[in-house]
């Protein structure tokens, strides 16, 4: 089962500004498109909406998402560094009372903070938390999160999703094992919630299906690990790691523009543009990894999609 997350980072947080007013319209249009897709294909999509801000704002956004038929909210901790971990857990409880919650470990470079094992266990213990996205971009912190879930009595009720764009393939291949009450508990990331997956998506789906074949414990070929390094390389270019992610969203837009899916790279914030040299770096990864893009697939379907 696949899904779609909207009103999250790649959608641009500025949609929430009163003078922009696009939060509800974006959710509504996306809902309509997902309805159309499900009716045409008979498939079911998991519908995730982003929720941000203090508890009052996040609860209001959750109510909007619920009214539009979304399944869960991805609850961002961004901009809440002044809150204690206990206050963040209380916020999670409040939003989970509105609708199912996906917890979110956000990297510090994008407004997140270090969160403890105890915090993640408390989040996992929260009724209504159905999943957690780990985008710490840090292996130590990723283990804190997974260990917190492993030691929660609700561990079997929570799906783990990687948001670590710097470690996608390894995250999806790695079993995490912990001794809990005299027994070994194994957890894995079951999928990804990744801005990176908004581009070259057809290739992403094929890679994900291939990675799933190695969950039975068989030996992992070195070629897959090499491909993981390639994915990290071109992700770093799209997300503009060289400039501390300043051109992250324009980088995604540029890939979509080259494929004919967008008319330009504009963002709601006019100062958010491609960084110096980023377009050349996108040229480089296109040349280095032609087998990993999905340009041919997009070209084959573009006329129908844009009709």
Name the predicted role of every residue range:
Residues 34-41, 151-158, 215, 263, ...:
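Structural alpha-beta junctions
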Residues 63, 206, 254:
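Surface-exposed charge patches
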Residues 233-307:
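C-terminal extensions of enzymes
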Residues 94-97, 107-248:
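Catalytic alpha/beta core domains of metabolic enzymes, predominantly
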Residues 1-118, 295-306:
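Active-site beta->alpha loop and helix N-cap motifs at the rims of alpha/beta catalytic domains
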Residues 57-60, 144, 171-172, 277:
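Short, solvent-exposed polar/charged micro-motifs at secondary-structure junctions
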């Amino acid at each position: 089962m696949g899904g779609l997350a909207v009103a999250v980072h790649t959608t641009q947080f500025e949609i929430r500004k009163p003078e922009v007013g696009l939060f509800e319209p974006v959710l509504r249009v996306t809902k309509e498109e997902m309805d159309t897709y499900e009716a045409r294909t008979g498939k079911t999509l998991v519908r995730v909406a982003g929720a941000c801000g203090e508890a009052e704002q996040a609860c209001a956004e959750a109510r909007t998402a619920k009214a539009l038929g979304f399944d869960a909210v991805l609850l961002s901790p961004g901009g809440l560094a002044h809150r204690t971990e206990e206050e963040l857990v209380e916020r999670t409880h409040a939003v989970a009372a509105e609708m199912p919650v996906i917890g979110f470990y956000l990297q510090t470079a994008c407004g997140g903070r270090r969160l403890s094992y105890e915090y993640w266990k408390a989040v996992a213990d929260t009724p209504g938390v159905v999943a957690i996205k780990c985008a710490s971009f840090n292996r130590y912190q990723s283990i804190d999160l997974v260990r917190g879930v492993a030691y929660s009595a609700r561990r079997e009720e929570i799906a783990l999703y990687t948001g670590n764009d710097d470690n996608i393939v390894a995250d999806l291949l790695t079993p995490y094992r912990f001794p809990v009450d005299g027994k070994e508990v194994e957890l894995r990331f079951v999928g990804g919630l990744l801005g990176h997956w908004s581009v070259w998506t057809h290739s992403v789906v094929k890679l994900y299906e291939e990675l799933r074949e190695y969950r039975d414990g068989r030996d992992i070929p070195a070629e897959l690990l090499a491909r993981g390094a390639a994915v990290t390389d071109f992700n770093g270019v799209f997300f503009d790691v060289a400039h501390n992610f300043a051109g992250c969203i324009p980088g995604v837009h540029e890939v979509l523009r080259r494929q004919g899916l967008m008319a330009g790279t504009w963002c709601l914030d006019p100062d958010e543009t491609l960084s110096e040299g980023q377009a050349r770096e996108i040229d480089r990864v296109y040349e280095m990894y032609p087998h990993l893009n999905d340009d041919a697939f997009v070209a084959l379907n573009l006329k129908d999609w844009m009709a």
